[in-house]
Amino acid sequence: MSDLIQPKVLKGFRDFLPADEIERALLMERLVKVFRDYGFVPIDTPALEYSEILLRKSGGETEKQVFRFSDNGGRDVAMRFDLTVPLARFVAEHKSEIYFPFKRYHLGKVWRGEKPQAGRYREFLQCDFDTLGSDSAAVDFEILRLIKKALNELGVSNFKIHVSHRGIFNRFLKSLNLSEDSEEVLRIVDKLAKIGEDEVLKLLTDISSEESAKKILAYISGVSKELKSEDFEKTLSHLENLAGGPDEDTKRMRDIYALVKAVGIEDSIVFDPSITRGLDYYTGVVFETFLNDLPSIGSVCSGGRYDNLTALYMKECITGVGASIGLDRLLAALELLGHQKTKASFTDLLIFSLPEDDLVLSYKIVNFFEAEKINAEVYPEPKKMNHQYTYAEKKDIRWGLFLDKDSCVEEFDKAPQRFKIKLKDMTNRTEDETPLSEAVKKIRASKN
């Protein structure tokens, strides 16, 4: 017995039991429907890429978290840490085979060696949607609109999309003579929610004067004492003045917000200049989405515009904007908020097995229900009924079916609709003799 290997998973990695995986699959189905409704198409890319592909524009913090190693051929490879950088490589490699604007969605696992905590894992599922090949404010807006629609479809309504613009912040940093340190400043500011203002001020003071560090903190607080953070337009005007006046970036934000107001989703959008996104490839509008009832879990959907990402892989720059839903983090949040899981299986009806039953007849009945779009399965052997009831309970199967001991295939073949069975409602603990046609009606009614 001492030679047995202890069954366990690595820290930050997880197994998914059926109920959890069903919940995740159903959420993904809803998301895919939204993406398709908005004109997005699916792609897939490898989990493993050349390290130089993934790390050239990711930033030092990300490079520390990436799973990187030499493969059996001695190649320097890494597990993808997001789905955006592989997208840039994909577009550069397949440019002649795709069309622009290219609207894609991608659901897949990514890997980051960060510290595991509530809602944060080292292996997790991301759900990305991006549009490449257009620099229009309409495309930026459409991503925000899609975030709103997607989260609503998942049953999430109490949230805010926090929006900012890197260009405005970079212009502000230029006024402080900190342009050369802008990427480091952005990474420090991105840690504000994790480490707090005092620690951010300390880190900023390491690369600038104390006066400049305090000005940066004042900027990312976003508002003066007279302004409310919910007032997008006043906040934008305030930051515009700090950055030196109007320019194309502040115009872009006004154009986006005009579209936001036009479709009536302004209550879900807030201007938050502390949002900078730690990845170096973002160049324009950036955003993160927080649940009002559970802000501590972090952003459940984030992204932004990246105008230069494909320049690493091709001479032509193809601009893009997109977002990523952290589906596993969102599921963890829904569980913490008390949302109930849907089902433990997709089976509607279990046909019980008794010693005298004819399996041929049982499977003919399965075919009958399948034709009626009802998922049925046969318990494979005539075990004691308490075993079969437990099986149905564990799989959350509401309906059970017993064959009459005198039932025969010939009787079923003559008139399947009128063939009588015993239908057991295992939720209400009732049992009725009924023709199959009526059983179909009862089961369908319970699913609606």
UniProtKB/Swiss-Prot annotation:
Gene3D superfamilies attached to this UniProt entry: Anticodon-binding domain, Bira Bifunctional Protein, Domain 2
Enzyme Commission identifier(s): 6.1.1.21
Entry keyword annotation includes Nucleotide-binding: yes
InterPro entries to which the protein is assigned, alphabetical: aa-tRNA-synth_II, aa-tRNA-synth_II/BPL/LPL, Anticodon-bd_dom_sf, His-tRNA-ligase, HisRS-like_core, HisRS/HisZ
Catalysed reactions, semicolon-separated: tRNA(His) + L-histidine + ATP = L-histidyl-tRNA(His) + AMP + diphosphate + H(+)
Keywords from the named record: Aminoacyl-tRNA synthetase, ATP-binding, Cytoplasm, Ligase, Nucleotide-binding, Protein biosynthesis
Keyword check for Nucleotide-binding: yes
Subunit structure: Homodimer.
Name of the protein described by the UniProt record: Histidine--tRNA ligase
Naturally occurring in which organism (per UniProt): Treponema denticola (strain ATCC 35405 / DSM 14222 / CIP 103919 / JCM 8153 / KCTC 15104)
